[in-house]
């Protein structure tokens, strides 16, 4: 049993390599090279090389090993992670205003994540394919077409899911990290003087003696920890233990060996700054390394794509984005999903970015602001969790978290110097995402307020129907309702136009809780309102996809048996009109109306058979 358990743990750890560490693991392709980019004013002198490698070492140790692996991974919600989860965890049982503020921080984090998701696949695959220029400069014109082809194919096969090919991700990344370690270790053996960079005085002296150059250079140094957020975001899939084991036993040693190896190469040959990663390898290994690097960056891109699907689904269920099609690509893994609209929007953004920036060096300017912004928000939310849930004292939070926040904010400030050179791009994507999410949330609140204002109290309505019932027809009718307090508009319109009532009426409200998963026992609240009337409130976690079939199974456990094929579903379809009434700016109302018109119908989202649905329109002025 123990041997089998150990094998299972190792399999999960191997799988985590392919998903969690793809982005972080491909940073050696460009991070050190960009730290010596000409505009930064730092030359690859022995002192400069030791200073930068020292900064890399301590950045990885502080940000990844200490902050994320030791601290942030502790802040799980039933095993789940991610910045929205952290915001939900921090805001739980807080007053409404404080809760709204913390959830807003979570939304900003989601926006920054989406901004980062457009940059990561572009810079990763582009930096790998640029190895062609190292093999032979004549191949330079083919870099962009090959990069675009690889990414178009990757996005084009997303609807098949990653269940099959995903099994190869772990072994490929295992080989990748092994090659990173071997190349670095060999070069360190040739020039062990680079190991002096472990001494933090090299980093501190550089920052003290050349503060201006050091500050700007930090904007490139942070590239060595891009992708760290994935450790926390993917915790629900692989577990804290597997992620920590993979980091400590393989990923961290491989990354450090490779960065130190690149530094050793530069000490020996400063001209290798042209592309220190590829020049670590002997010429006969250049082409196989190019193939392996491209595979590794495709895997890193896949992790970002899957992460974006997951974050968008979470935002949809929490009511921050309109409903859209969510396809499950695996019968066994609930987390493996495909969102067609997100897929093609993401690809469109990536293609525009690649054509605009043309090279990984130009793209590096756009990379960093979103990453460091997310890191700073994570630390802020972590401080709230530490105070409220872990019961840390103020002095302990000040001792542990305040220095981490200072590091995050320093990196963020350093990256703002790249704003005009390209840093504006992920911020633009982030602002657009935040605008869409806040507009949708506010719009739905306005719609719900107006529907409740126009409707009748449920209890009084049921009493009236029992006292003076209309014509009863056989069968069961389910009325989907957004509120548990009032009568659904579909019911009022049905009585107004058809003047009939079914023998059994169920008012169904689906609510998303601020927990990731709920047990089957927590699925429904069933209330018998009177003869022939039932109210069902179905609860789902924000990581679950609401299922009508599961709701009816839970009802059957409570002796309310409902057969989908013999049930009629009544829904109200809102026709929204933008007006000058108070609520939202006119242009935001227009955006909300457009999103509402193009959102997935409730029938499709809940997979209700179309031939069992009756839709009744309601006109609402915003």
Which residues are covered by each model-predicted region?
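The structured alpha-helical core of multi-pass membrane proteins
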Residues: 1-622
């Amino acid at each position: 049993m123990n041997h089998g358990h150990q094998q299972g743990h190792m399999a999960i750890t191997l799988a985590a390599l392919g998903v969690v560490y793809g982005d972080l693991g491909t940073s050696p392709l460009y991070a050190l090279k960009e730290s010596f980019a000409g505009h930064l004013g730092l030359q690859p002198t022995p002192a400069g090389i030791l200073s930068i490698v020292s900064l890399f070492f301590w950045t990885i140790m502080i940000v990844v090993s200490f902050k994320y692996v030791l601290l942030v991974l502790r802040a799980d919600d039933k095993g789940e992670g991610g910045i929205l989860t952290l915001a939900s965890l921090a805001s739980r049982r807080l007053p409404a205003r404080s809760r709204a503020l913390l959830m807003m921080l979570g939304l900003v984090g989601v926006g920054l994540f989406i901004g980062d998701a457009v940059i990561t696949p572009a810079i990763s695959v582009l930096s790998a394919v640029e190895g062609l220029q190292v093999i032979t400069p004549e191949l330079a014109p083919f870099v962009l077409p090959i990069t675009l082809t690889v990414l178009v194919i990757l996005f084009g096969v997303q609807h098949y899911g990653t269940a099959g090919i995903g099994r190869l991700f772990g072994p490929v990344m295992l080989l990748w990290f092994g090659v990173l370690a071997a190349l670095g270790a060999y070069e360190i053996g040739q020039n062990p003087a680079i190991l002096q960079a472990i001494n933090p005085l090299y980093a501190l002296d550089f920052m003290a003696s050349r503060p201006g150059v050091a500050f700007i250079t930090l904007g490139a140094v942070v590239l060595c920890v891009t992708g760290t957020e994935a450790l926390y975001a993917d915790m629900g899939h692989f577990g804290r233990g597997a992620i920590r084991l993979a980091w400590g036993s393989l990923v961290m040693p491989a990354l450090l060996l490779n960065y130190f190896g690149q530094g050793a190469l530069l000490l020996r040959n400063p001209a290798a700054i042209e592309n220190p990663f590829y020049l670590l390898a002997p010429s006969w290994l250049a082409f196989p390394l190019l193939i392996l690097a491209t595979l590794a960056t495709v895997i890193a891109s896949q992790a970002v794509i899957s992460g974006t699907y997951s974050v968008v689904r979470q935002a949809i269920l929490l009511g921050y984005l309109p409903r859209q099609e969510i396809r499950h690509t695996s019968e066994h893994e609930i987390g493996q999903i495909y969102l067609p609209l997100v897929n093609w929007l993401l690809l469109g953004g990536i293609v525009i970015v690649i054509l605009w920036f043309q090279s990984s060096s130009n793209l590096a300017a756009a990379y960093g602001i979103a990453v460091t912004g997310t890191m700073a928000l994570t630390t802020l939310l972590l401080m709230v969790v530490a105070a409220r849930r872990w019961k840390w004292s103020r002095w302990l939070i000040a001792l542990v978290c305040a220095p981490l926040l200072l590091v995050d904010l320093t990196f963020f400030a350093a990256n703002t110097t790249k704003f005009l050179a390209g840093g504006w791009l992920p911020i633009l994507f982030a602002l657009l995402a935040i605008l869409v999410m806040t507009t949708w949330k506010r719009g739905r609140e306005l719609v719900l307020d107006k529907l409740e204002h126009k409707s009748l109290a449920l209890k009084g309505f049921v009493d009236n129907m029992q006292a003076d019932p209309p014509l009863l027809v056989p069968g069961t009718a389910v009325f989907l309702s957004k509120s548990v307090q009032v009568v659904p508009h579909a019911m009022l319109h049905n009585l107004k136009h058809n003047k009939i009532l079914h023998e059994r009426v169920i008012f169904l409200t689906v609510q998303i809780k601020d927990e990731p998963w709920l047990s089957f026992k927590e699925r429904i609240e069933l209330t018998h309102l009177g003869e022939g009337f039932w109210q069902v409130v179905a609860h789902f976690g924000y990581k679950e996809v609401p299922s009508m079939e599961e709701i009816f199974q839970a009802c059957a456990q409570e002796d309310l048996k409902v057969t989908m094929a013999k049930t009629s579903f009544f829904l109200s379809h809102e026709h929204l009109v933008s007006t000058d009434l108070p609520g939202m700016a006119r242009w935001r109302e227009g955006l909300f109306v457009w999103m509402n018109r193009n959102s997935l119908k409730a029938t499709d989202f809940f997979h209700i058979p179309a031939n069992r649905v009756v839709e009744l329109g309601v006109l609402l002025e915003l």
